[in-house]
Design a protein with these regions (language model features):
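Bacterial Sec-dependent N-terminal signal peptides
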Residues: 1-20
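Positively charged, low-complexity terminal tracts
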Residues: 18-142
Length: 142
């Protein structure tokens, strides 16, 4: 009888320790581009931590679909990305913004306008000035 009573009292504590509920949410901030070469900026919240990710299909390989993720550990890191885009927008052809985990290069193409090449962790994508403006506006709202 004592063993049964002890089992009834201890089992809820043991069971609670085995199951952990994690609150997490992924919110799409902006779909920069859709279609064959998508780019999206997302906010991921887990418990009290928030990080941001830029997901894109790498353009290095035309025959396979490889989605790369550039992770920003907090809003401050995301703001640095925005500042890099803003500095390149005001800059000239060939300017480069280098960060620890990624690099953005401005490329001016005659008749096509300004575009940017983002490289990170073996992935590469490009985007046009209107897409960069959409990202900067979305980051500014955060």
């Amino acid at each position: 009888m004592k063993n049964l009573l002890l089992l009834i009292l201890i089992s809820p504590m043991v069971m609670k320790a085995q199951f952990k509920i994690v609150n997490s949410a992924t919110i799409n901030i902006v779909d920069v581009r859709q279609g064959t070469w998508p780019i999206s900026l997302q906010r991921i919240t887990k418990q009290s931590d928030t990080c941001f990710v830029l997901q894109f299909r790498t353009q290095e390989y035309n025959n396979s679909v490889i989605i790369k993720t550039l992770k920003f550990r907090d809003l401050e890191q995301l703001k640095y990305f925005q500042q890099g885009l803003a500095a390149l927008k005001a800059g000239n052809n060939g300017d480069v913004a280098e960060f620890k985990d990624y690099t953005i290069k401005r490329v001016d193409v005659y008749k096509a306008g300004t575009s940017y090449i983002l490289t990170c962790d073996g992935g590469l994508t490009n985007f046009q000035q209107p897409e960069a403006d959409r990202m900067m506006a979305a980051i500014k709202k955060q």
